[in-house]
Structures are given as C-alpha cells and as structure tokens.
Design a protein with these regions (language model features):
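Compact, glycine-rich, soluble single-domain proteins
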Residues: 12-47, 51
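Eukaryote-biased recognition of intrinsically disordered, low-complexity regulatory segments
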Residues: 1-8
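Glycine-centered recognition micro-motifs in short, flexible terminal segments and loops
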Residues: 66-67
C-alpha cells in the first residue's frame, strides 16, 4: 500500500498503481482532466505508464462545460 496526497487529501492506494488506475478508481478515466504529479504536468500519453509512489502529491482538475 502507498500513501499519496490527492487534491490535498491523504489517500491510501494499492502498490504499483498508475495514474490511469487512479483515474479509473474515481471514474475520471473518460473525462477531460489535467494531472499534476509532484509539481509536474503529466501528458495524457503517460497516464498508463506513470506509477505512483509513497508520498506523491497529485492534483487532478476536470473540466465541466457550461454556458
């Protein structure tokens, strides 16, 4: 198990979790999102291969349309 900080909240996840796994867990995999991992913006093409580590800080922002 790994402890991470997700949008300012402490969360425990399984070891060897990827950013894509995290998005699936929170039902955001099919949404338009931007992800910052430890201060660096991660490109969408890297979500599957980027593994999360203990004490990582992740910010996920998803876009909502409106008028």
């Amino acid at each position: 198990m790994s402890k991470i900080q997700l949008n300012g909240k402490k969360v425990v996840i399984k070891s060897n979790y990827s950013l894509l796994d995290l998005l699936k867990k929170y039902k955001l995999a099919n949404k338009k999102v931007a992800i910052e991992l430890n201060g660096t913006i991660i490109q969408k093409t890297g979500y599957k291969k980027k593994k999360l580590n203990n004490n990582d800080k992740i910010e996920i922002v998803h876009f909502i349309g409106g008028g």
